[in-house]
């Protein structure tokens, strides 16, 4: 207590026999009560040390002093003034209201003689501003002290500001007690954030902010207007980087409307940042301090699980949230009573805020009692579920609880007595597990009864070994004995009406006695390469064509065979085409013979060449012609010479007609000039040429190159050359050697080599 007085700047007052003098000296205001019994019960609340004598024994006890001081049904609406103005204590309550003559601040305690039980409390300890007819700012205006009376310390302006905006102080408890004793009474008794009991003042008495209490307690601010189109998350975080308590921010877009959401560690930091931006002259943002959704805030504060009904649970989370340890809730059996009582008023707000959620919540009926009876029952009848009286409350319910929650006490076949509650444990009928397979039928028959359930999680009596409780370990059913004959041994006879036992009977009579053990495949050292073929998808299935369908298609039927007459006609047509081509070729050759002095042959002479480096270009140009055989390029003096040999004379004639005047280089004017060679390539005698020309005129142009060689051979025979038919090369070489020994001219032997060319290896 001495530390509390040191925090408030008050000297420790001496002990006094009169409790009223103590209250006046300590600065505790006491309101006027209407009943004498309540004053007498309050007389035993405090002793000389200023602490509480007795803790609350039970919630429903009429002699409990806390029931008189902290009545749940008379909780006033919390003031919208930010709780950051409270310099004393940890509870976000109101500041002490000064008395009429400020005697407790000046150290002079004036009180009438009399005792506390006779309701003789000094009027100096009561603020006259609370003598109005209403506590919500409606009705007659309150009476405030004259303006010439001032407080003697620095808290005067704050206390006066606290008294002016709203008159929501509790009638039964002075704010001084709330500010001076934060550790003696649980903090949830001081929490008066439930605004549903008393509506807000219709005159709008909040002078600091027009936001609601939930908005001021929110750690999230939203910028709903004034955001430029090119405003991104990086620029948004740059605005709040140096703000105290800033966590993170983001920009969201809903239906084309962009808004920014900024998260802070607490509501004070969010309020400071909001006020700082509003005070800026360059600020064009529309800022509100409000949660996006209560469930998002639950996810933001780590440690608080998300809830499905925000209206029912958001208020109790804010009331039971521990400000000393951010991010962790503070639930206990001591404050569970206040949470339950506030749910009654939360449902009324939920019907207006979330009508669809309320209808969905009402449609969920886990019990068999009428739905209206459950919803109309007061939550306070559930009691204070402290660990010391949980079992007593459940085993001895009230009349309403017995009618609604329908506790059932049954005995199973083994004579074990258990208690069930379908509301607290909706899955109780499935929580009983059999010990072995033989008892499956027994457990099913027990669970099929309408009013027979297993043991609940609130019953801690270990009389049922298979019951599942919150602190008990989950026990699996014992495994039945298994033998080599693939049969299970049970103590009772198998019931064929039970599907489980029928399956066991079929398994026992199955011809398969033992199945081979399944061994896992080991992965080889080279990885999954051997299984690559198995991992490939199967090829696409293509159906085989039906032979009957294929044969029935007219396009695939066998074509008729050609007749002999048709073949003869085709052969005659081909011969006529060849004769026509030969006639055309003969006319071309005759015209060339008339213009050219040399007789036509299969060798073409290429003239008008000035550059000796044109051999590659000539080979590339003539190699594309049909019947090309070889090219001979020679240089005599300064002028190059080129001969091109073809397989047949007709090919040479076509090539000469096509390539006549072709320009291989820009330096040569007129292009190349083509003419028949005097001698075929390799033939040097002029006599042979005359003989070949005479044969050509007699028999017509040859069709193949072999005809040219046959003409040369016949000319040689006329000159009485010696011919021998020799197939192997050595025999031909020996014959040539023998011929050289004879009296023949060397020119004649060279002609033989030109006619008979031996293949080289």
From Swiss-Prot:
UniProt GO MF annotations: mRNA binding
GO cellular component, one term: cytoplasm
Key word Acyltransferase present: no
Keyword Methyltransferase appears in the UniProt entry: no
Biased composition (Low complexity): 199-211
Disulfide feature: none
Pfam families: RRM_1
Comp. bias regions, Polar residues: 31-46, 58-83, 99-110, 442-466
Residue spans of biased composition, Basic and acidic residues class: 188-197
Keywords: mRNA processing, mRNA splicing, Repeat, RNA-binding
InterPro entries the record matches: Nucleotide-bd_a/b_plait_sf (IPR012677), RBD_domain_sf (IPR035979), RRM_dom (IPR000504)
Gene Ontology annotations of biological process type: mRNA processing; regulation of mRNA catabolic process; RNA splicing
SUPFAM superfamilies with a match to the protein in the record: RNA-binding domain, RBD
Location of region: Disordered: 31-110, 188-213, 442-468
RRM domain sequence ranges: 223-289, 602-679
Misc. comment: Transcription is induced by mei4 transcription factor.
Cross-referenced PANTHER family: U1 SMALL NUCLEAR RIBONUCLEOPROTEIN A/U2 SMALL NUCLEAR RIBONUCLEOPROTEIN B (PTHR10501)
Protein name: RNA-binding protein mde7
Source organism of the structure: Schizosaccharomyces pombe (strain 972 / ATCC 24843)
């Amino acid at each position: 207590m001495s530390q509390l007085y040191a925090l408030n700047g008050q000297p420790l007052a001496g002990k006094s026999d009169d409790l009223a003098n103590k209250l006046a000296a300590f600065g505790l205001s006491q309101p006027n009560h209407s009943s004498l019994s309540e004053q007498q019960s309050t007389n035993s609340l405090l002793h000389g040390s200023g602490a509480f004598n007795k803790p609350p024994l039970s919630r429903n006890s009429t002699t409990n002093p806390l029931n008189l001081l902290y009545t749940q049904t008379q909780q006033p609406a919390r003031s919208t003034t930010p709780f950051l103005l409270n310099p004393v204590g940890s509870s976000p309550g109101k500041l002490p209201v000064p008395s009429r003559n400020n005697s407790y601040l000046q150290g002079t305690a004036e009180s009438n003689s009399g005792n506390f039980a006779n309701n003789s409390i000094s009027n100096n300890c009561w603020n006259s501003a609370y003598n109005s007819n209403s506590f919500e700012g409606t009705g007659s205006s309150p009476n405030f002290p004259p303006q010439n009376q001032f407080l003697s310390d620095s808290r005067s302006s704050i206390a006066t500001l606290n008294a002016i905006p709203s008159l929501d102080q509790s009638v039964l408890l002075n704010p001084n007690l709330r500010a001076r004793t934060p550790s003696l009474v649980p903090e949830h008794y001081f929490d008066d954030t439930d605004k549903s009991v008393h509506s807000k003042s219709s005159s709008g008495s909040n002078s600091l902010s027009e936001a609601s209490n939930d908005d001021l307690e929110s750690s999230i601010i939203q910028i709903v207007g004034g955001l430029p189109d090119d405003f991104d998350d990086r620029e948004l975080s740059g605005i709040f980087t140096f703000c105290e308590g800033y966590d993170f921010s983001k920009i969201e877009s809903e239906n084309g409307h962009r808004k920014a959401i900024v998260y802070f560690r607490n509501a004070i930091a969010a309020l400071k940042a909001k006020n700082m931006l509003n005070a800026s002259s360059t600020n064009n943002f529309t800022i509100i301090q409000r949660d996006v959704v209560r469930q998002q805030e639950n996810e933001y504060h780590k440690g608080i699980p998300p809830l499905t009904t925000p209206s029912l649970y958001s208020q109790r989370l804010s009331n039971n949230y521990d400000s000393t340890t951010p991010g962790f809730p503070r639930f206990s059996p001591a404050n569970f009573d206040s949470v339950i009582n506030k749910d009654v008023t939360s449902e009324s707000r939920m019907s207006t805020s979330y009508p669809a959620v309320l209808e969905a919540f009402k449609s969920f009926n886990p019990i068999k009692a009428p739905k209206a009876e459950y919803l109309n029952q007061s939550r306070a009848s559930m009691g204070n579920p402290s660990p010391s009286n949980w079992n007593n409350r459940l085993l001895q319910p009230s009349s309403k609880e017995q009618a609604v929650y329908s506790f059932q006490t049954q005995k199973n076949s083994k004579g074990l007595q258990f208690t069930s509650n379908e509301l607290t444990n909706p899955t109780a009928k499935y929580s009983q597990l059999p010990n072995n397979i033989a008892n499956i039928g027994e457990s099913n028959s027990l669970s099929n009864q309408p009013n027979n359930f297993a043991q609940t999680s609130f019953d801690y009596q270990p009389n049922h070994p298979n019951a599942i409780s919150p602190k008990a370990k989950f026990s699996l059913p014992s495994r039945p004995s298994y033998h080599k004959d693939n049969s299970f041994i049970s103590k009772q006879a198998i019931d064929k009406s039970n599907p489980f036992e029928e399956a066991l009977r079929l398994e026992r009579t199955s011809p398969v006695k033992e199945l081979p053990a399944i061994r896992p495949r080991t992965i080889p050292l080279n990885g999954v390469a051997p299984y690559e073929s198995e991992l490939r998808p199967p090829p696409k299935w293509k159906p085989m064509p039906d032979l009957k369908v294929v044969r029935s298609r007219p396009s695939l039927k066998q074509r008729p065979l050609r007749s002999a007459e048709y073949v003869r006609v085709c052969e005659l047509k081909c011969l006529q085409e060849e004769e026509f081509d030969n006639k055309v070729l003969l006319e071309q050759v005759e015209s060339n013979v008339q213009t050219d002095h040399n007789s036509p042959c299969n060798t073409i002479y290429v003239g008008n060449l000035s550059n000796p480096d044109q051999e590659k270009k000539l080979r590339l140009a003539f190699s594309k012609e049909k019947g090309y055989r070889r090219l001979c390029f020679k240089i005599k003096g300064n002028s190059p010479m080129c001969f091109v040999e073809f397989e047949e004379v007709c090919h040479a004639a076509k090539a000469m007609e096509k390539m006549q005047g072709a320009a291989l280089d820009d330096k040569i004017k007129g292009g190349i000039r083509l003419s028949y060679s005097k001698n075929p390539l390799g033939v040097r005698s002029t006599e042979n040429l005359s003989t070949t020309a005479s044969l050509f005129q007699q028999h017509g142009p040859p069709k193949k190159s072999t005809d040219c060689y046959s003409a040369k051979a016949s000319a040689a025979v006329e000159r009485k050359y010696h011919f021998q038919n020799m197939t192997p090369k050595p025999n031909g070489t020996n014959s040539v050697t023998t011929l050289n020994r004879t009296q023949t001219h060397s020119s004649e032997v060279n002609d033989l080599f030109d006619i008979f060319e031996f293949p080289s290896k």
